[in-house]
């Protein structure tokens, strides 16, 4: 019964409200053939420009991947060592029981 009274409160919000404009509208659009109209043709790029862009993108991706490898070569210190405590000093101060700070 509770669900019946609950749905009854939604009926006024769901009821269809009559539209202010009653009739249907018809729009007619005339095509323009003026010489002043800008052309919608797609201009083709030369293949050399596209190749240059492709090679530049490939070179940029290669540089980014090499930079990631160079940054990843730095080894993590073993947990509990002085090097680990020095590198993660802020973590060790705020959470002294963190695994990196102790054995």
Swiss-Prot record:
Keywords: Chloroplast, Membrane, Photosynthesis, Photosystem II, Plastid, Thylakoid, Transit peptide. GO terms for cellular component: chloroplast thylakoid membrane; cytosol; photosystem II. Coiled coil: none annotated. InterPro entries: PSBT. The keyword Thylakoid applies. One of its GO terms (biological process) is photosynthesis. Its main location: plastid. The maturation of the PSII-T precursor to its final form occurs through a two step process. First, a stromal intermediate is formed, which, upon translocation into the thylakoid membrane, is processed to the mature protein. The keyword Translocase does not apply. It is found in: Plastid, Chloroplast thylakoid membrane. Residues 1-75 form a transit peptide. May be a component of the oxygen-evolving complex. PANTHER family: PHOTOSYSTEM II 5 KDA PROTEIN, CHLOROPLASTIC (PTHR34940:SF5). This is Photosystem II 5 kDa protein, chloroplastic. It comes from Arabidopsis thaliana (Mouse-ear cress). The lineage of its organism: Eukaryota, Viridiplantae, Streptophyta, Embryophyta, Tracheophyta.
